[in-house]
Amino acid sequence: YPAVNAMLIDKTDKKTRQNAFSLLYLGTNIGIAVGPLMAGFLINDYLFLFFMIDAATTIISLIPILLWVKDTLPTEEEKESVPEDDSERAEIGNIFKVLLRRPVLIAFIFISIIYSMVYAQYSFGVPLFADHVFGLYGPRYYGIIMTVNAVLVVVFTIFIVSFTARIRPLINISIAGILLALGFGMLYFSEALYLFLISTFLWTMGEILFTVNTSVFVANNSPISHRARFNSVVFFVSQSGFALAPLITGQLIVSIGIVNIWPIIFLLAVAASLIMLGLYSFQKKVSLKQGIK
């Protein structure tokens, strides 16, 4: 959501962004949890009403923004007010030239591709594996897993964000990688529903940490003059892992079997976590050397 993220960045500072993005993430997931439930009740007998409610809620969500949120595009005075030693200082040039001046962000984007490939297993590897383990009960149990995921996001987002608020975004993302590794990796040993649910708890905690802190990190390292464009490019490239995951995972399943993909997913997530930790150390050294806040 480049436009929404850019508007949120404009309205917050580095101290309040994590809380703001966590609330946005929480609200989005409440809608994701409630939407299918409402659809299940309405879609068979009240199809027209279903689409009317869908359109109405979209319009209603826009009204507060139109009425109370002023244009957030930074003025020239606001751009000039950002200190030269701040990572959000304004830049001159097109998106690609400006991005090349920020190698840490480029590295972050490509590491995020691995994260998204791992996380994408919730919608590809997990349902296939549930079918493999539970047979005819696979779809039903996968529905339970996704319901648990939605409930966990709604219940735990505020607690997770509050608990990790003082930790740097890249460290949080590194921790998220370990949680994703444990959550998906343990499926190798899982043959009962309760183990799948423990797995879901772990990778959902990783999902929360990764999603919220990715938005915060990109926001804190985007120039005030290119916020929406940076968000667009980062989202497009980093989320390409979701496109690659089914292709690569499908080939692996054919070659080595669905059970044996989970150790590979585990190693990928651990590697991404360690690389992200290394990126944090590199950024810290560069920032100290250049005097960037």
Indicate where each model-derived feature is located:
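A late C-terminal transmembrane helix in Major Facilitator Superfamily
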Residues: S225-I256
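Cytoplasmic helix-loop-helix junction between adjacent transmembrane helices
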Residues: Y1-T28
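Structural signature of the two symmetry-related core transmembrane helices
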Residues: I171-G185
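Helix-loop junctions on the cytosolic side of multi-pass membrane transporters
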Residues: I65-E80, G278-G291
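Symmetry-related core transmembrane helices of the 12-TM Major Facilitator Superfamily/SLC fold
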Residues: F50-L67, W262-G278
